């Protein structure tokens, strides 16, 4: 059994003896960077050496200096520089700068090497103050190339996010006096040992831990199997990633104060109740209600919707909030679905919640799959990472399905049952049913999302075993979705997103063809959905009522500008609307506050009767899709202020209108009076909401 620490020690001893035999030009110093400088050298590592010489011409005979190293069959990367040239490297390239910070004396003029390193450190501290963003951008580019160590089935132990390079970056930030150095020695040691043994078993320098090498590495390190090793590596990488995230946040907090920018252009804009945008960072209001159990969801939903970062102090304070009661309030469930509805931001927000111990409050099953290595070789990510990638894929299609909230919930839970001795589809279906119950979903919705998770592999099995054009294939699929059109459409989207998130070669032309054919034929068998007009009881002209924690504006009249202007002036968001046209409009608008305003019926009535408020904002452009059910137009678009009114202003005469919010998607159905042109209506709607 190989001892990685002993291997590094023996290799370093051998190399230092070799370097000590070199005859250096007078007045020069031989210094090391890279793995030798950090005492991380393996038998297959490159030697990174710098010959430092005083200002002036390069000493004679330098070319002959390196032959003993080459004769010893060592891989060498060398340079010859003056102290000024070494210092200049700090500004030239942040990757090279990190290497220069490790500069270690090997032989020759030790004082020359020490003075050079002191100047390098001083220059690094200056550079961080001036070009901190460039250092971060270099790290981000590296993460994009290599992926996160915590989430990959073939993790890059050195360059991946949470890997050895990130540990070095934390040390560099601490050396720049921008953060404290966290205690990560054990995590660093595990990654270093694993990489050392990877070199030994691969018989070459390598950073990606493939499964075939992971078996031997796990055995050498005393793990039961490679899956246990994978979990420990993921935990170590997660700790390093958390440490770096904290270090970067601390550094950002220090640097603006040094330059004076922190006190310029200070602005605070409300995003939701007790949630504000403070100069591009999401923070809590000045006096937030930390006894509100739904506050963490509102903060996370705002982050997912806007893409803004959440202040580290805000995440910490949210841990003071109590757990949600069951079933969840309707607004809390809506915020949860908003968190999952952003293709770009959902993954980042969920990971931040998880890093601060908040995600498992709402998804207690998550901890079981965190860092779990899949058994299938087709997977390139851990189960939790794959699940979030599937959610992101489904979030791209939220306007193409009738129930985007159930779609993203099913995507989140579709593989959460893995790691049990029973079929993961069955276990996951049971888990998502319990989750849907906690969220307060009705029986029909619970049944739909439970079926979605239980049958999420159905199409792949049909494609592998049956002709997708056959009646038998259609029968099998309809049986799987319980002859439910909504579930069928959700399954089609989830199947594609799941395959694309699994790995290369899973989403094939054959699977795509089978999916499209069998789903289309199954849809043709089912009856189209027939939208139903809303039920609205007769009432007086204006009122504000509360039912089960939902506030509803009741209105009867002709001037939509007037009622909607008051709602928008008070900073309320319309989450649902029910409208009937019978000479005049009879309508109900479900609303929620974006701030601490009271839902005072008397104040609302006074504002309405004043007639002062009639301005309705023009909505920002967003993704929009249209569908027809006879004379009823269904519009699905991103939830945003003013979207409902923009649509009403565009549509021809309508008999009734029904609008609901599903996650971050607004779904509006409008039954139009006969005599309209479909193409004209569609163009007008898309132009007003999507701009094209």
Curated annotation (Swiss-Prot):
GO molecular function, one term: hydrolase activity
Domain of life: Bacteria
Alphabetical keyword list: Hydrolase, Magnesium, Multifunctional enzyme, Nucleotidyltransferase, Transferase
Region (Uridylyl-removing): 271-692
Keyword Magnesium: yes
Functional description taken from the UniProt entry: Modifies, by uridylylation and deuridylylation, the PII regulatory proteins (GlnB and homologs), in response to the nitrogen status of the cell that GlnD senses through the glutamine level. Under low glutamine levels, catalyzes the conversion of the PII proteins and UTP to PII-UMP and PPi, while under higher glutamine levels, GlnD hydrolyzes PII-UMP to PII and UMP (deuridylylation). Thus, controls uridylylation state and activity of the PII proteins, and plays an important role in the regulation of nitrogen assimilation and metabolism.
Protein name per Swiss-Prot or TrEMBL: Bifunctional uridylyltransferase/uridylyl-removing enzyme
Organism per entry: Corynebacterium glutamicum (strain ATCC 13032 / DSM 20300 / JCM 1318 / BCRC 11384 / CCUG 27702 / LMG 3730 / NBRC 12168 / NCIMB 10025 / NRRL B-2784 / 534)
């Amino acid at each position: 059994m190989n001892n990685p620490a002993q291997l590094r020690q023996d290799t370093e001893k051998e190399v230092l003896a070799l370097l000590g035999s070199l005859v250096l030009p007078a007045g020069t110093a031989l210094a090391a960077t890279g793995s030798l400088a950090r005492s991380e050298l393996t038998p297959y590592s490159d030697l990174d050496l710098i010959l430092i010489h005083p200002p002036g011409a390069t000493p004679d005979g330098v070319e002959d200096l390196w032959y003993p190293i080459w004769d010893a069959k060592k891989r060498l990367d060398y340079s010859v520089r003056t102290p000024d040239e070494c210092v200049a490297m700090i500004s030239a390239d942040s990757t090279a700068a990190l290497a220069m910070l490790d500069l270690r004396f090997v032989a020759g003029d030790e004082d020359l090497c020490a003075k050079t390193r002191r100047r390098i450190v001083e220059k690094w501290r200056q550079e961080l103050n001036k070009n901190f963003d460039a250092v971060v951008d270099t790290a981000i580019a590296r993460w994009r190339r290599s992926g996160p160590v915590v989430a990959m089935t073939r993790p890059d132990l050195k360059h991946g996010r949470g890997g050895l390079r990130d540990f070095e970056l934390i040390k560099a930030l601490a050396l720049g006096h921008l953060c404290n150095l966290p205690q990560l020695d054990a995590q660093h040691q595990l990654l270093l040992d694993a990489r050392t043994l990877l070199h030994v078993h691969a018989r070459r320098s390598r950073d990606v831990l493939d499964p075939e090498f992971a078996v031997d590495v796990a055995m050498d390190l005393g793990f039961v199997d490679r899956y246990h090793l994978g979990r420990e590596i993921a935990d170590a990488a997660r700790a390093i990633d958390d440490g770096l995230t904290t270090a970067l946040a601390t550094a950002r907090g220090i640097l603006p104060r040094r330059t004076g920018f922190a006190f310029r252009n200070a602005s605070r804009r409300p995003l939701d109740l007790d949630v504000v945008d403070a100069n591009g960072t999401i923070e809590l209001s000045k006096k937030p209600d930390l006894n509100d159990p739904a506050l963490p969801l509102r903060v996370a939903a705002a982050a997912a919707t806007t893409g803004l970062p959440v202040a580290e102090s805000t995440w910490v304070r949210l841990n003071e909030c109590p757990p949600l009661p069951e079933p969840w309030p309707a607004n809390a469930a809506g915020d949860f679905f908003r968190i999952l509805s952003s293709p770009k931001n959902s993954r980042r927000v969920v990971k931040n919640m998880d890093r601060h111990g908040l995600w498992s409050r709402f998804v207690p099953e998550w901890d079981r799959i965190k860092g779990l290595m899949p058994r299938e070789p087709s997977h390139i990510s851990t189960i939790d990472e794959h699940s979030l990638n599937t959610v992101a894929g489904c979030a791209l299609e939220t306007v193409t399905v009738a129930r985007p909230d159930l779609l993203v919930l099913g995507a989140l839970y579709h593989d959460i049952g893995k790691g049990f001795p029973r079929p993961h589809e069955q276990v996951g279906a049971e888990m998502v049913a319990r989750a849907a119950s906690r969220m307060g979903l009705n029986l029909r919705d619970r049944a739909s999302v439970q079926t979605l998770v239980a049958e999420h592999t159905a199409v792949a099995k049909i494609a592998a075993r049956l002709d997708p054009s056959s009646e038998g294939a259609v029968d099998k699929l309809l049986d799987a979705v319980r002859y439910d059109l909504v579930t069928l459409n959700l399954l089609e989207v989830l199947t594609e997103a799941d395959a694309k998130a699994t790995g290369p070669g899973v989403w094939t032309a054959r699977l795509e063809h089978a999916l499209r054919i069998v789903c289309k034929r199954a849809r043709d068998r089912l009856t189209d959905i027939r939208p139903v007009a809303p039920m609205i009881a007769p009432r007086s002209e204006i009122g504000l009522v509360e039912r089960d924690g939902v506030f509803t504006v009741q209105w009867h009249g002709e001037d939509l500008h007037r009622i909607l202007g008051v709602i928008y002036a008070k900073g309320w968001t319309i989450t649902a609307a029910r409208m009937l046209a019978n000479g005049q409009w009879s309508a109900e608008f479900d609303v929620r506050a974006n701030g601490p305003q009271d839902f005072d019926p008397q104040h609302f009535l006074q504002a309405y009767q004043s007639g002062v408020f009639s301005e309705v904002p023009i909505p920002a452009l967003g993704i929009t899709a249209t569908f027809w059910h006879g004379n009823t137009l269904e519009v699905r678009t991103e939830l945003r202020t003013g979207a409902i009114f923009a649509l009403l202003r565009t549509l021809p005469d309508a008999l009734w209108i029904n609008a609901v919010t599903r996650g971050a998607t607004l779904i509006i159905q409008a039954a139009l009076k006969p005599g309209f042109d479909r193409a004209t209506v569609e163009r007008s709607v898309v132009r007003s909401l999507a701009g094209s």
